Amino acid sequence: MGVAVRVVYCGAUGYKSKYLQLKKKLEDEFPGRLDICGEGTPQVTGFFEVLVAGKLVHSKKGGDGYVDTESKFLKLVAAIKAALAQG
């Protein structure tokens, strides 16, 4: 089993496509090494929260916005690499 990456997103806001784009990009970066799951909220929450190995790494509600820049993506990559190094 790979590193657990969990994305909680606002399903009612239509963020599923953003989740799927992020999932594909992470799978391309770490083929076969991640266990990615997404959960869309049925009510409007504005969520786009990314947890790596149970640790909150990215939070739209916390002011991070979407994972829409290379620097935001690299922050996730660094967290995943650290989790992989810990085994």
UniProtKB/Swiss-Prot annotation:
The record's Gene3D superfamilies line, in alphabetical order, gives:
Glutaredoxin (3.40.30.10)
Molecular function (GO) terms listed?
A: antioxidant activity
Query: One cellular component GO annotation, for this chain's record?
Result: cytosol
Keywords in alphabetical order: Antioxidant, Cytoplasm, Glutathionylation, Redox-active center, Selenocysteine
Disulfide bond positions: none
Where exactly is the Cysteinyl-selenocysteine (Cys-Sec) cross-link placed along the chain? C10-U13
Q: Which GO terms of type biological process are on file?
A: response to selenium ion
Q: What is its main location?
A: cytoplasm
Q: Where in the cell is it found?
A: Cytoplasm
Q: Which residues carry this modification: S-glutathionyl cysteine?
A: C37
Looking up Pfam families in the UniProt record yields: Rdx
According to the record's subunit comment, the protein's assembly and interactions are: Interacts with DPYSL2, PRDX1, YWHAB, YWHAG, HSP70 and HSP90.
What family does the Swiss-Prot or TrEMBL record give for this protein? Belongs to the SelWTH family. Selenoprotein W subfamily.
User: Could you tell me which PANTHER family the record lists for this protein?
Assistant: SELENOPROTEIN W
Q: What does this protein do?
A: Plays a role as a glutathione (GSH)-dependent antioxidant. May be involved in a redox-related process. May play a role in the myopathies of selenium deficiency.
Q: What is this protein called?
A: Selenoprotein W
Give the source species.
Answer: Sus scrofa
What high-level taxonomic lineage is stated for the organism?
Answer: Eukaryota, Metazoa, Chordata, Craniata, Vertebrata
